[in-house]
């Protein structure tokens, strides 16, 4: 029985290895050289920890050199930590005069990782509460909320539960109810590709394969949009996480999925929010159908919408400058 099971596992692993997503040769060559290079510093602001519900939560606050127009609070997507934000995007926000705060969710980055999540599950509202505690520690009264994917859902929870602490809401490629039976569901074939990718590059554990896995994920997230992935930038950021932080928590994706399902629909509450809202979604998103953001734009009072051509479930490098200009205009409404 043991030998038979082992044979099955080997066969399945071989099939996944042969059929799973791969990356082009030029990306492999770039990754091979990056592994041997010196990793630059990715954390340039003031850092610290807060304690929220017995979790130690890591944050970074980057303040402009000149006058501060306001504060932007960033909420990252599923399985990612604070370092998932493109450096060029952070630099643009700070140059535009906005103090920019990013933080590691529970179970990611330098924040506490916990087992036994099933016994004491947390919700998206708890993640939003962690962000409020960070603002309290920095004596910041209000912030502009910007969330991507899962982060868009957390930002929505913040706007719903702490409206007096929110200036604006920007929800990017997200949903107000991810299991809405009246909307197209999350792309299951895409999820299968993610699983295949994880298996393909986890059979042999090495820094190179971790980098390859993350670059391949970015290529999958691009969908059928036509733009180049920043292989060097993604690889350097991942390598920094491996060598200078705690790496990646393999269990956090499941915990975050459970938090999403526990949180359920936010439609009723979103119909009542009063903060200016901007809804953004890529028209080539292979993961969350754009109809989810269309529903958000429909139910949030006065919400503005931007449907972006040639954008998947990621922020393309070539769009960072124009996206920053759009956001700064939105922020100026408050």
Which ranges hold each PLM region?
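Conserved acidic catalytic loop of the alpha/beta-hydrolase fold
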Residues: 125-143
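Short beta-strand/loop motif that positions the catalytic acidic residue
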Residues: 273, 279-281
